[in-house]
């Protein structure tokens, strides 16, 4: 999951980052 988070943050930015953070909390 951590690796995916990095990829998302690097690929997109704030929008994707927020979405990923929400999923992690879930």
UniProtKB/Swiss-Prot annotation:
What does this protein do, in the record's words?
Answer: Destroys radicals which are normally produced within the cells and which are toxic to biological systems.
**Could you tell me which species this protein originates from?**
Paralichthys olivaceus
What this protein catalyses is: 2 superoxide + 2 H(+) = H2O2 + O2
Q: How does it assemble?
A: Homotrimer.
Lipidated residue numbers (S-palmitoyl cysteine): 7
Q: Which gene is annotated as encoding this protein in its UniProt record?
A: sod1
Family, similarity comment: Belongs to the Cu-Zn superoxide dismutase family.
Details of cofactor binding? Binds 1 copper ion per subunit. Binds 1 zinc ion per subunit.
Q: What is its EC number?
A: 1.15.1.1
Name where it mostly resides.
cytoplasm
- UniProt-recorded Gene Ontology molecular function terms: metal ion binding; superoxide dismutase activity
Could you list this entry's UniProt keywords, alphabetically sorted. Antioxidant, Copper, Cytoplasm, Lipoprotein, Metal-binding, Nucleus, Oxidoreductase, Palmitate, Zinc
Task: Write out the GO biological process terms.
Answer: removal of superoxide radicals
* Cofactor(s), names only, from the UniProt record: Cu cation; Zn(2+)
- GO CC terms on record? cytoplasm; nucleus
Please identify the protein, giving its name as recorded.
Answer: Superoxide dismutase [Cu-Zn]
Tell me yes or no: is Thylakoid among this UniProt entry's keywords. Answer: no
Where in or outside the cell it occurs: the entry states: Cytoplasm; Nucleus
């Amino acid at each position: 999951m951590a690796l995916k988070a990095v990829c998302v943050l690097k690929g997109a930015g704030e929008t994707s980052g927020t979405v990923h953070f929400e999923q992690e909390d879930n």
